[in-house]
């Protein structure tokens, strides 16, 4: 009997007391450290009109970005078509990350800047129809010894974007990745501009299925000024609308909302 009591105390201490105390202290410290502007730009907020007309209006310092790449993108037919689409909510990625936490975010901190993610990703989101387009530029420091972008980074971009695409359609506007399936077709050379396209395929209660892919950014510039850049398929007589963009990878994401998330709707923690 004398040995049983210490054993039970150790069991309760390890299984109940210590985990509860650790969780309580962790949540308390986390919430205290969370910036005051954390809830300013959450997915629960109404869309604000006309945040951006030009990609140069960035929340990230322009000295950390490739201005020449931004200029090329702004002249492209793809960008202008998206920017003029009234269904699309146009923001920069940094606008969705609280300013106090950007430096700790992988894509906005560790992997952002010259030689890395060289522009603040341009986001076009049709929330009602579950469609998302994001434009990135992948710098030279994101490559392996063969000069191709690391697959781990591409996996991160796909996971993050597909979740972002599906979050607004979940009951509590947030969830977790239950499964992410990836398939890579071709390597992406460094110093390449790419487009990520995603769309929600199925939404059922607390479960959401999203598909997406990475493709090459088209080099043709917009014809809004009446001219186009040199493009051999056009010279040879091919219709640019019939050309298929090169796909580098595709992904399928199953997003779920844990039942207990509904109790934290009031807390803009995540």
Swiss-Prot record:
- State the superkingdom: Eukaryota
GO CC term (a single one): mitochondrion
UniProt xrefs under InterPro entries: HotDog_dom_sf, PTE-AB_protein, Thioestr_dom
Compartments, as annotated in UniProt: Mitochondrion
State where the transit peptide lies.
Answer: 1-12
User: Mostly located where?
Assistant: mitochondrion
Query: Mind listing the UniProt keywords for this protein, alphabetically?
Result: Mitochondrion, Transit peptide
Q: What else is known?
A: Present with 704 molecules/cell in log phase SD medium.
Summarize subunit and interaction data from the UniProt record for this chain: Associates with the mitochondrial ribosome.
Task of the protein: Component of MIOREX complexes, large expressome-like assemblies of ribosomes with factors involved in all the steps of post-transcriptional gene expression.
Record's protein name: MIOREX complex component 3
Native organism = Saccharomyces cerevisiae (strain ATCC 204508 / S288c) (Baker's yeast)
Q: What is the lineage of its organism?
A: Eukaryota, Fungi, Dikarya, Ascomycota, Saccharomycotina
The gene coding this protein: MRX3
């Amino acid at each position: 009997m004398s040995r049983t009591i210490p054993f039970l105390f150790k069991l309760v201490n390890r299984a109940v007391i210590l985990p509860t105390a650790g969780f309580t202290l962790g949540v308390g410290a986390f919430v205290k450290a969370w910036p005051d502007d954390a809830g300013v730009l959450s997915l629960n907020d109404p869309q604000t009109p006309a945040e951006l007309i030009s990609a140069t209006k960035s929340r990230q310092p322009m000295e950390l970005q490739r201005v020449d790449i931004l200029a090329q993108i702004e002249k492209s037919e793809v960008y202008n078509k998206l920017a003029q689409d009234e269904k699309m909510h146009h923001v920069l990625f940094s606008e969705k990350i609280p300013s106090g936490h950007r430096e700790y975010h992988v894509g906005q901190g560790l992997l952002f800047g010259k030689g890395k993610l060289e522009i603040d990703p341009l986001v076009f989101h049709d929330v009602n129809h579950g469609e998302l387009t994001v434009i990135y530029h992948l710098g030279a420091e994101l490559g392996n010894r063969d000069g191709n972008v690391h697959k781990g980074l591409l996996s991160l971009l796909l996971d993050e974007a597909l979740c972002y695409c599906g979050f607004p359609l979940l009951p509590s506007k947030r969830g977790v990745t239950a499964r992410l399936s990836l398939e890579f077709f071709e390597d992406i050379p460094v110093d390449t501009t790419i487009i990520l396209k995603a769309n929600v395929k199925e939404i059922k209660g607390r479960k959401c299925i999203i598909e997406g892919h990475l493709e090459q950014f088209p080099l043709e510039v917009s014809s809004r000024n009446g001219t186009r850049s040199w493009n051999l398929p056009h010279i040879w007589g091919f219709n640019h609308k019939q050309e298929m963009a090169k796909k580098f990878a595709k992904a399928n994401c199953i997003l779920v909302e844990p039942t207990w998330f509904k109790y934290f709707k009031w807390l803009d923690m995540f």
